[in-house]
From Swiss-Prot:
This is leu operon leader peptide. GO terms for biological process: L-leucine biosynthetic process. Involved in control of the biosynthesis of leucine. It comes from Salmonella typhi. Transmembrane segments: none annotated. It comes from the Bacteria. The gene is leuL. The keyword Nucleus does not apply. Keywords: Amino-acid biosynthesis, Branched-chain amino acid biosynthesis, Leader peptide, Leucine biosynthesis.
Amino acid sequence: MSYIVRFTGLLLLNAFIVRGRPVGGIQH
């Protein structure tokens, strides 16, 4: 279940970063 938590955390963090910053410089 560790990988699930890590995957969810990564998705949340990625979504938060994309929402906080305009998509253009970092498109991962």
